[in-house]
């Protein structure tokens, strides 16, 4: 296990909290453990904010969860498999873990995936500190695996970036990840599909639209519309993506939601992001 002083140093370097760095370190080892298991490696495609940071853009915002799409609809995340993942993490890092929750996800009485919460006692502690009961641990990782998702682009092989003094295994030298276009098309759909308005979705679309190279927005729009139809949703106009209600909600939550994931000096004002996204959405969907 890395030392607490490394967590402290990285927190100062990135201008975020120690708990954010501790979780980032732990996330890397969870990805490593998951892709060290053949059944996971063969079925799972890494996606989401942690994928963007770990596999595409090393100085991207920090993330909190692990998200995957399974290309095998028969894949099962049961307690035995999850404990196998945990055992690998513990063996490689010395991290103490506690399985908090494992849930079957369902929609209209049909299984759609799995969500797990694993508490961890990470590196942000003195080595001689005895961990309290897991009920008092405040750090955890959420893992979500979706079984039924329409993928429009081939996955791409990426290496997991791990900016810490310990090392990951060769299992993550190449792992299957979402194409950036796939990420963006799902982020667009999330603006409509989520039951809550997530500032990170707006930030991710804004950031990738500005800094990702050679994006084909016609392909992304097509994929977005296909994904909407796959979920039984209809796109009627950009007011579904940005409207007074969502803007007010996101603006109020902007700093609280993203402030622990990005240094304050790097976090753009929501009004700047909103202005850029209005222009982007009007350009992409001008014929709809």
Whereabouts are the PLM-identified features?
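Glycine-rich beta-strand-to-loop/alpha-helix junction loops that act as flexible
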Residues: 46-50
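Structured mid-to-C-terminal alpha-helical surface segments
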Residues: 1-44, 54-60, 64-66, 70-288
């Amino acid at each position: 296990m890395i030392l607490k002083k490394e967590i402290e140093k990285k927190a100062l370097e990135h201008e975020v909290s120690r708990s954010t760095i501790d979780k980032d370190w732990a996330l890397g080892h969870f990805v490593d453990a998951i892709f060290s298991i053949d059944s996971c490696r063969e079925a799972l495609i890494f996606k989401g904010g942690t994928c963007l940071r770990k596999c595409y853009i090393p100085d991207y915002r920090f993330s909190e969860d692990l998200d995957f799409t399974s290309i095998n609809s028969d894949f099962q995340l049961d307690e035995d498999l999850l404990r196998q993942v945990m055992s690998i993490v513990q063996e490689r890092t010395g991290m103490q873990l506690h399985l908090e929750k494992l849930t079957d996800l369902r929609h209209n009485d049909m299984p759609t995936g799995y969500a797990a919460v694993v508490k961890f006692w990470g590196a942000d502690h003195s080595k001689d500190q005895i961990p309290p009961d897991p009920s008092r641990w405040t750090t955890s990782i959420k893992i979500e695996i979706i079984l039924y998702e329409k993928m429009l682009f081939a996955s791409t092989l990426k290496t997991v970036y791990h900016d810490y003094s310990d090392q990951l295994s060769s299992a993550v030298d190449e792992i299957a990840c979402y194409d950036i276009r796939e990420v963006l098309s799902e982020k667009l759909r999330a603006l409509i599909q989520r039951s809550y308005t997530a500032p990170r979705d707006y930030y991710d679309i804004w950031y990738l639209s500005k800094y990702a190279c050679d994006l084909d927005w016609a392909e992304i729009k097509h994929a977005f519309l296909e994904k909407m139809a796959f979920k039984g949703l209809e796109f009627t106009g950009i007011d579904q993506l940005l409207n007074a209600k969502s803007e007010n909600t996101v603006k109020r939550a902007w700093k609280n939601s993203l402030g622990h994931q990005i240094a304050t000096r790097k976090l753009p004002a929501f009004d700047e992001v909103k202005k850029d996204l209005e222009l982007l959405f009007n350009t992409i969907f001008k014929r709809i």
